[in-house]
Amino acid sequence: MQKIIGALLIFALLLTGCRYNTPREKQEDEKKHSKIELYSAQDDELLQTIDNQDTVNKLLNTSDWEVIESISDDLKPEYIMLAYQEKTLLYGQDPNEARDYELIATVITYQNSSYIKEIISSTVIKNMIIPENALIFYYAMPDDIQEDLHELIDE
């Protein structure tokens, strides 16, 4: 009996040490892709679709931006950016198959202003009901990001 328990204990220890490690490159490839559709606020014309991940991340990373409590009602919208992200890969789905995108945020820029309004899509937060005004944020967009955005539009 002691031999069986000892063998099971050794077997269990061996199994816990034999964990499969995914290479870092493969993990990075499996990240969800994002894209931005950039529209004119005046006529809702699609100006550009941005799917370069570095550019998307740069335009949407608001972590270092100045948070503003509110913005003036006098500001006129200039551009509307719709940010999309690939839907989560579900069990049984082929990882090589193209996935649909879901809207995660709407960002509105304003004429002659560095202020933006970010509206987080309520579909991003699953299984919770959050008031709509809790999903709206205002920021002052840094000058370099603003310049990058205008360069993308002028291309």
Positions of PLM-derived features:
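Hydrophobic alpha-helical segments, principally membrane-spanning helices and signal/leader peptides
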Residues: 1-2, 42
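Function-determining sites in protein domains
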Residues: 19-155
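Sec-dependent signal peptide recognition
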Residues: 2-10
